UniProtKB/Swiss-Prot annotation:
<dbReference type="GO" id="GO:0009289">
    <property type="term" value="C:pilus"/>
</dbReference>
<feature type="signal peptide">
    <location>
        <begin position="1"/>
        <end position="24"/>
    </location>
</feature>
<keyword id="KW-0465">Mannose-binding</keyword>
<dbReference type="Pfam" id="PF00419">
    <property type="entry name" value="Fimbrial"/>
</dbReference>
<dbReference type="InterPro" id="IPR008966">
    <property type="entry name" value="Adhesion_dom_sf"/>
</dbReference>
<dbReference type="GO" id="GO:0043709">
    <property type="term" value="P:cell adhesion involved in single-species biofilm formation"/>
</dbReference>
<dbReference type="InterPro" id="IPR050263">
    <property type="entry name" value="Bact_Fimbrial_Adh_Pro"/>
</dbReference>
<protein>
    <recommendedName>
        <fullName>Uncharacterized fimbrial-like protein SfmH</fullName>
    </recommendedName>
</protein>
<comment type="similarity">
    <text>Belongs to the fimbrial protein family.</text>
</comment>
<dbReference type="GO" id="GO:0007155">
    <property type="term" value="P:cell adhesion"/>
</dbReference>
<keyword id="KW-0430">Lectin</keyword>
<keyword id="KW-0732">Signal</keyword>
<dbReference type="GO" id="GO:0005537">
    <property type="term" value="F:D-mannose binding"/>
</dbReference>
<keyword id="KW-0281">Fimbrium</keyword>
<dbReference type="InterPro" id="IPR036937">
    <property type="entry name" value="Adhesion_dom_fimbrial_sf"/>
</dbReference>
<comment type="function">
    <text>Part of the sfmACDHF fimbrial operon. Could contribute to adhesion to various surfaces in specific environmental niches. Increases adhesion to eukaryotic T24 bladder epithelial cells in the absence of fim genes.</text>
</comment>
<dbReference type="InterPro" id="IPR000259">
    <property type="entry name" value="Adhesion_dom_fimbrial"/>
</dbReference>
Protein backbone atom coordinates (compact mmCIF):
# COMPACT_ATOMS: atom_id res chain seq x y z
CA UNK A 1 0.00 0.00 0.00
CA UNK A 2 1.41 3.37 -0.95
CA UNK A 3 1.06 6.33 1.36
CA UNK A 4 0.96 9.83 -0.06
CA UNK A 5 1.45 12.99 1.92
CA UNK A 6 0.76 16.46 0.63
CA UNK A 7 2.52 19.15 2.65
CA UNK A 8 1.60 22.75 2.04
CA UNK A 9 3.84 25.51 3.34
CA UNK A 10 2.08 28.55 4.73
CA UNK A 11 2.83 31.82 3.04
CA UNK A 12 4.09 33.89 5.95
CA UNK A 13 3.90 37.66 6.20
CA UNK A 14 5.59 37.57 9.58
CA UNK A 15 8.40 40.02 10.09
CA UNK A 16 10.45 41.13 13.06
CA UNK A 17 11.09 44.86 13.12
CA UNK A 18 14.08 46.65 14.66
CA UNK A 19 15.16 50.08 15.83
CA UNK A 20 15.74 52.22 12.75
CA UNK A 21 19.22 53.18 14.03
CA UNK A 22 20.20 49.53 14.36
CA UNK A 23 20.63 49.85 18.14
CA UNK A 24 17.94 49.54 20.81
CA UNK A 25 17.61 52.82 22.73
CA UNK A 26 17.01 53.06 26.47
CA UNK A 27 14.47 55.15 28.37
CA UNK A 28 15.99 55.42 31.85
CA UNK A 29 14.52 56.35 35.22
CA UNK A 30 16.90 57.67 37.87
CA UNK A 31 15.56 56.77 41.32
CA UNK A 32 17.95 59.14 43.11
CA UNK A 33 16.32 61.99 45.04
CA UNK A 34 12.88 60.36 44.87
CA UNK A 35 12.39 59.32 48.49
CA UNK A 36 12.09 61.43 51.63
CA UNK A 37 10.92 61.04 55.21
CA UNK A 38 7.27 61.33 54.13
CA UNK A 39 7.09 58.79 51.31
CA UNK A 40 9.67 56.36 52.71
CA UNK A 41 6.90 54.44 54.46
CA UNK A 42 5.58 50.87 54.01
CA UNK A 43 2.74 50.70 51.49
CA UNK A 44 3.40 54.20 50.18
CA UNK A 45 3.00 54.56 46.41
CA UNK A 46 5.36 57.10 44.88
CA UNK A 47 4.60 58.40 41.38
CA UNK A 48 7.66 59.56 39.47
CA UNK A 49 7.39 62.66 37.29
CA UNK A 50 5.59 61.77 34.07
CA UNK A 51 7.66 61.50 30.90
CA UNK A 52 4.96 63.24 28.90
CA UNK A 53 6.70 63.44 25.53
CA UNK A 54 7.06 60.79 22.86
CA UNK A 55 9.86 58.36 23.62
CA UNK A 56 11.49 59.39 20.35
CA UNK A 57 12.05 55.87 19.03
CA UNK A 58 11.58 54.83 15.41
CA UNK A 59 11.39 51.28 14.10
CA UNK A 60 11.84 49.78 10.66
CA UNK A 61 10.45 46.52 9.32
CA UNK A 62 12.38 44.44 6.78
CA UNK A 63 11.60 44.13 3.07
CA UNK A 64 8.76 41.71 2.47
CA UNK A 65 6.50 43.12 5.17
CA UNK A 66 3.06 43.13 3.55
CA UNK A 67 0.99 44.93 6.19
CA UNK A 68 1.00 48.47 7.53
CA UNK A 69 0.07 47.70 11.13
CA UNK A 70 2.31 46.38 13.90
CA UNK A 71 2.13 44.65 17.26
CA UNK A 72 4.03 45.82 20.30
CA UNK A 73 5.24 43.66 23.21
CA UNK A 74 6.54 44.79 26.60
CA UNK A 75 8.54 41.93 28.08
CA UNK A 76 10.00 41.73 31.58
CA UNK A 77 11.98 39.28 33.67
CA UNK A 78 10.26 40.49 36.83
CA UNK A 79 7.20 38.74 38.28
CA UNK A 80 3.92 40.58 38.81
CA UNK A 81 3.10 40.52 42.53
CA UNK A 82 -0.17 42.46 42.59
CA UNK A 83 -2.42 44.68 40.49
CA UNK A 84 -3.69 48.04 41.78
CA UNK A 85 -5.86 50.28 39.57
CA UNK A 86 -4.75 48.24 36.53
CA UNK A 87 -1.08 48.84 37.35
CA UNK A 88 0.85 45.55 37.49
CA UNK A 89 3.35 45.82 40.35
CA UNK A 90 6.51 43.73 40.09
CA UNK A 91 9.21 43.31 42.73
CA UNK A 92 12.12 45.32 41.38
CA UNK A 93 14.22 45.35 44.54
CA UNK A 94 14.21 44.17 48.16
CA UNK A 95 12.54 47.45 49.08
CA UNK A 96 10.34 48.24 46.09
CA UNK A 97 7.56 47.11 43.80
CA UNK A 98 7.23 48.94 40.51
CA UNK A 99 4.57 49.36 37.83
CA UNK A 100 4.12 51.41 34.68
CA UNK A 101 1.55 52.79 32.29
CA UNK A 102 2.05 54.37 28.90
CA UNK A 103 -0.09 55.77 26.14
CA UNK A 104 -0.05 54.80 22.47
CA UNK A 105 -1.34 57.31 19.93
CA UNK A 106 -3.98 54.83 18.73
CA UNK A 107 -4.56 52.22 21.44
CA UNK A 108 -4.58 54.70 24.36
CA UNK A 109 -3.36 53.64 27.83
CA UNK A 110 -1.51 50.35 28.32
CA UNK A 111 -0.34 48.62 31.49
CA UNK A 112 2.68 46.42 30.76
CA UNK A 113 3.88 43.71 30.86
CA UNK A 114 1.79 42.71 27.87
CA UNK A 115 2.56 41.00 24.58
CA UNK A 116 1.36 41.53 21.03
CA UNK A 117 -0.75 44.66 21.44
CA UNK A 118 -2.22 45.59 18.05
CA UNK A 119 -1.20 49.15 17.27
CA UNK A 120 -2.15 51.62 14.55
CA UNK A 121 -1.11 51.77 10.93
CA UNK A 122 1.67 53.59 9.13
CA UNK A 123 2.38 53.35 5.38
CA UNK A 124 6.12 53.19 6.09
CA UNK A 125 5.77 49.77 7.73
CA UNK A 126 5.49 47.93 4.41
CA UNK A 127 7.89 50.29 2.62
CA UNK A 128 11.00 49.40 4.66
CA UNK A 129 11.06 52.98 5.97
CA UNK A 130 11.31 54.27 9.58
CA UNK A 131 8.08 54.86 11.49
CA UNK A 132 7.47 56.17 14.99
CA UNK A 133 6.88 53.89 17.96
CA UNK A 134 4.34 56.26 19.43
CA UNK A 135 4.69 55.57 23.16
CA UNK A 136 4.27 58.62 25.38
CA UNK A 137 3.07 59.77 28.82
CA UNK A 138 5.10 57.10 30.61
CA UNK A 139 4.12 56.90 34.28
CA UNK A 140 6.34 54.92 36.67
CA UNK A 141 4.91 54.05 40.07
CA UNK A 142 6.91 52.65 42.99
CA UNK A 143 5.43 50.98 46.05
CA UNK A 144 7.56 50.85 49.19
CA UNK A 145 7.44 47.36 50.72
CA UNK A 146 10.34 47.91 53.10
CA UNK A 147 11.40 51.45 54.08
CA UNK A 148 14.97 52.44 53.30
CA UNK A 149 17.56 53.22 55.95
CA UNK A 150 20.74 55.10 55.03
CA UNK A 151 21.87 54.78 51.42
CA UNK A 152 20.91 51.93 49.10
CA UNK A 153 22.50 51.54 45.68
CA UNK A 154 20.04 50.14 43.11
CA UNK A 155 21.99 48.85 40.09
CA UNK A 156 20.75 49.82 36.64
CA UNK A 157 18.34 47.15 35.43
CA UNK A 158 16.00 46.73 32.48
CA UNK A 159 12.35 46.78 33.52
CA UNK A 160 10.83 46.26 30.05
CA UNK A 161 12.21 45.24 26.69
CA UNK A 162 9.98 46.48 23.87
CA UNK A 163 9.56 44.55 20.61
CA UNK A 164 7.72 45.44 17.39
CA UNK A 165 6.42 42.74 15.04
CA UNK A 166 3.94 42.49 12.17
CA UNK A 167 1.99 39.50 13.53
CA UNK A 168 1.10 38.19 17.00
CA UNK A 169 3.17 35.08 16.28
CA UNK A 170 6.58 36.51 15.48
CA UNK A 171 9.45 35.67 17.85
CA UNK A 172 10.43 38.42 20.26
CA UNK A 173 14.13 38.50 19.47
CA UNK A 174 15.08 42.03 18.35
CA UNK A 175 14.53 44.78 20.94
CA UNK A 176 13.46 48.18 19.63
CA UNK A 177 13.94 49.98 22.93
CA UNK A 178 14.19 49.30 26.65
CA UNK A 179 12.89 50.94 29.81
CA UNK A 180 15.35 50.83 32.71
CA UNK A 181 15.73 52.09 36.27
CA UNK A 182 18.42 52.51 38.91
CA UNK A 183 20.07 55.02 41.16
CA UNK A 184 21.38 55.80 44.61
CA UNK A 185 18.57 56.12 47.14
CA UNK A 186 19.45 58.26 50.16
CA UNK A 187 16.85 58.95 52.84
CA UNK A 188 16.79 60.98 56.08
CA UNK A 189 16.30 57.80 58.12
CA UNK A 190 19.84 56.92 59.11
CA UNK A 191 21.58 54.44 61.42
CA UNK A 192 25.28 54.61 62.22
CA UNK A 193 27.05 51.40 63.22
CA UNK A 194 30.05 51.26 65.52
CA UNK A 195 30.37 55.06 65.34
CA UNK A 196 31.23 54.71 61.65
CA UNK A 197 34.29 52.55 62.33
CA UNK A 198 35.09 49.21 60.68
CA UNK A 199 34.25 46.16 62.79
CA UNK A 200 37.33 43.95 62.64
CA UNK A 201 37.81 40.35 63.78
CA UNK A 202 41.51 39.40 63.89
CA UNK A 203 42.29 35.72 64.47
CA UNK A 204 46.07 35.94 64.22
CA UNK A 205 48.14 33.06 62.84
CA UNK A 206 46.40 29.72 62.16
CA UNK A 207 48.22 26.68 60.81
CA UNK A 208 47.20 25.81 57.23
CA UNK A 209 46.95 22.09 58.04
CA UNK A 210 44.32 22.83 60.71
CA UNK A 211 41.89 23.95 58.01
CA UNK A 212 42.27 20.82 55.89
CA UNK A 213 41.95 18.69 59.03
CA UNK A 214 38.73 20.50 59.96
CA UNK A 215 37.05 19.77 56.63
CA UNK A 216 34.76 21.98 54.55
CA UNK A 217 32.46 24.25 56.51
CA UNK A 218 34.23 23.68 59.82
CA UNK A 219 36.27 25.81 62.18
CA UNK A 220 39.90 24.73 62.76
CA UNK A 221 40.61 23.06 66.09
CA UNK A 222 41.67 25.41 68.85
CA UNK A 223 40.35 28.56 67.15
CA UNK A 224 37.61 30.17 69.21
CA UNK A 225 34.87 32.49 67.94
CA UNK A 226 35.30 36.18 68.68
CA UNK A 227 32.53 38.41 69.98
CA UNK A 228 31.91 42.09 69.22
CA UNK A 229 29.18 44.41 70.45
CA UNK A 230 28.03 46.71 67.64
CA UNK A 231 26.65 50.06 68.77
CA UNK A 232 23.72 51.27 66.66
CA UNK A 233 22.61 54.90 66.78
CA UNK A 234 19.74 56.03 64.56
CA UNK A 235 18.53 59.45 63.43
CA UNK A 236 15.02 60.20 62.13
CA UNK A 237 14.01 56.68 63.16
CA UNK A 238 11.39 56.35 65.88
CA UNK A 239 12.54 55.37 69.36
CA UNK A 240 11.62 51.78 70.29
CA UNK A 241 11.48 50.86 66.58
CA UNK A 242 11.96 47.22 65.65
CA UNK A 243 14.89 46.79 63.27
CA UNK A 244 17.07 44.02 61.86
CA UNK A 245 20.74 43.65 60.96
CA UNK A 246 21.90 41.56 58.01
CA UNK A 247 25.11 40.87 56.14
CA UNK A 248 26.08 41.61 52.54
CA UNK A 249 29.18 40.24 50.81
CA UNK A 250 30.45 39.87 47.26
CA UNK A 251 31.84 36.32 47.58
CA UNK A 252 29.67 33.76 49.36
CA UNK A 253 29.65 30.01 49.86
CA UNK A 254 26.59 28.76 51.73
CA UNK A 255 26.50 30.61 55.05
CA UNK A 256 30.08 31.86 54.77
CA UNK A 257 31.87 34.86 53.33
CA UNK A 258 34.67 33.62 51.08
CA UNK A 259 38.01 35.30 51.71
CA UNK A 260 40.67 36.39 49.22
CA UNK A 261 42.02 32.85 49.67
CA UNK A 262 39.33 30.76 47.96
CA UNK A 263 39.90 27.83 50.34
CA UNK A 264 39.04 29.90 53.41
CA UNK A 265 36.17 31.98 54.70
CA UNK A 266 34.36 33.35 57.72
CA UNK A 267 31.05 32.75 59.45
CA UNK A 268 29.31 35.73 61.07
CA UNK A 269 26.64 34.81 63.60
CA UNK A 270 24.37 36.16 66.32
CA UNK A 271 25.04 35.78 70.03
CA UNK A 272 23.69 32.21 69.91
CA UNK A 273 26.10 31.22 67.12
CA UNK A 274 23.30 31.08 64.56
CA UNK A 275 24.99 32.06 61.27
CA UNK A 276 23.81 35.07 59.28
CA UNK A 277 23.71 33.96 55.66
CA UNK A 278 25.19 36.75 53.51
CA UNK A 279 22.88 38.40 50.97
CA UNK A 280 19.80 36.67 52.41
CA UNK A 281 17.06 39.17 53.20
CA UNK A 282 15.50 36.73 55.66
CA UNK A 283 18.69 35.87 57.55
CA UNK A 284 18.83 38.66 60.11
CA UNK A 285 19.42 39.58 63.73
CA UNK A 286 16.30 41.33 65.06
CA UNK A 287 16.70 44.07 67.64
CA UNK A 288 14.82 47.01 69.11
CA UNK A 289 15.95 50.58 69.62
CA UNK A 290 15.76 52.10 73.07
CA UNK A 291 14.21 55.44 74.03
CA UNK A 292 17.25 57.23 72.60
CA UNK A 293 16.94 55.40 69.23
CA UNK A 294 20.06 53.37 70.05
CA UNK A 295 20.89 49.69 70.55
CA UNK A 296 23.75 47.24 70.89
CA UNK A 297 23.85 44.14 68.70
CA UNK A 298 26.14 41.19 69.45
CA UNK A 299 28.05 39.61 66.56
CA UNK A 300 30.23 36.52 66.67
CA UNK A 301 32.61 35.37 63.95
CA UNK A 302 35.05 32.57 63.23
CA UNK A 303 37.14 31.30 60.29
CA UNK A 304 36.29 28.09 58.43
CA UNK A 305 37.58 25.93 55.62
CA UNK A 306 35.54 26.42 52.44
CA UNK A 307 36.92 23.57 50.35
CA UNK A 308 38.54 21.21 52.85
CA UNK A 309 41.80 21.62 50.96
CA UNK A 310 45.02 22.72 52.60
CA UNK A 311 45.18 26.45 51.84
CA UNK A 312 48.14 28.41 50.58
CA UNK A 313 49.92 29.90 53.56
CA UNK A 314 49.69 33.63 54.08
CA UNK A 315 47.29 36.32 55.28
CA UNK A 316 43.64 36.07 54.26
CA UNK A 317 40.72 38.42 54.79
CA UNK A 318 37.12 39.04 53.76
CA UNK A 319 35.05 42.20 53.66
CA UNK A 320 31.33 42.32 54.38
CA UNK A 321 28.78 45.05 54.94
CA UNK A 322 26.27 45.27 57.77
CA UNK A 323 22.89 46.66 56.77
CA UNK A 324 20.10 47.78 59.08
CA UNK A 325 16.48 47.48 57.93
CA UNK A 326 13.06 47.92 59.41
CA UNK A 327 11.42 44.69 60.52
Amino acid sequence: MAMACLCLANISWATVCANSTGVAEDEHYDLSNIFNSTNNQPGQIVVLPEKSGWVGVSAICPPGTLVNYTYRSYVTNFIVQETIDNYKYMQLHDYLLGAMSLVDSVMDIQFPPQNYIRMGTDPNVSQNLPFGVMDSRLIFRLKVIRPFINMVEIPRQVMFTVYVTSTPYDPLVTPVYTISFGGRVEVPQNCELNAGQIVEFDFGDIGASLFSAAGPGNRPAGVMPQTKSIAVKCTNVAAQAYLTMRLEASAVSGQAMVSDNQDLGFIVADQNDTPITPNDLNSVIPFRLDAAAAANVTLRAWPISITGQKPTEGPFSALGYLRVDYQ
